[in-house]
Amino acid sequence: MFAECFENVRSTCPLIHNITNYVTVNDCANMVLACGASPIMADDAAEVEDITTICGGLNINIGTLNSRTITSMLLAGKKANLLGHPVVLDPVGAGASQLRTDTANRLLREVKFTVIRGNISEIKTLASGAGTTKGVDADVADKVTEENLDSAVAFAKTFAARTGAVVAITGAIDIVADAHKAYCIRNGHPMMSSITGTGCQLSALTAAFVTANPGHP
């Protein structure tokens, strides 16, 4: 299945609109290019609806959040929904500040997401409406382990059912779930926590894949 999905990205070369954070914007653009899709990184409210219209999918990342981009995210997200385009949410740092938590919750209320990808603390914050994170990293107390994996999977499936989105919780063990089934992935490496941007790049990559493979969200 992966080979087929990958080939679909390369053969269709979908244009992906990324409203993402300034720390990793270049890395995300290169990741989208490397997989065979095409990125555009427009975040001004005056043009985001136009840009979303010409794109196939939208990636929203709240990593370097500000009042200007909040407006842009809402405009682009609603436009994408109107057009039937897939939308990915990366709620970076949800729970670290009231602004981030409130914005992530508002996005969930006003935009329909195809995929929600974040670390376990961020996803728990979205599920409860409040929470705490260690900056943009997952709280150690929330870490998904083999011992608590069953409960983490059940949580992911419940949140997926509530939102109608595929929920991807990334960490030492990744969980990808919809309301009915879940997959656990154990291909991570401790060094990934020593650099910034791997999650942001994954969200951008996810947007490219779900856009090119509408039958496999």
Q: Where are these predicted regions, by residue range?
A:
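Small-residue (G/A/S/T)-rich helix-start motifs and N-terminal tracts that mark the onset
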Residues: 1-74, 79-81, 86, 153-217
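Residues that cap or flank secondary-structure elements
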Residues: 20, 68, 95-96, 147-148
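Short gly/pro/ser/thr-enriched loop/turn and capping motifs at secondary-structure boundaries
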Residues: 48, 94-95, 122-125
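Short beta-strands and strand-loop turn motifs
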Residues: 58-61, 86-91, 135-139
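Glycine/small-residue-rich loop that forms an oxyanion/phosphate-binding "nest" at active or ligand-binding sites
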Residues: 69-118
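Conserved phosphate/ATP/ADP-binding segment of small-molecule kinases
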Residues: 100-182
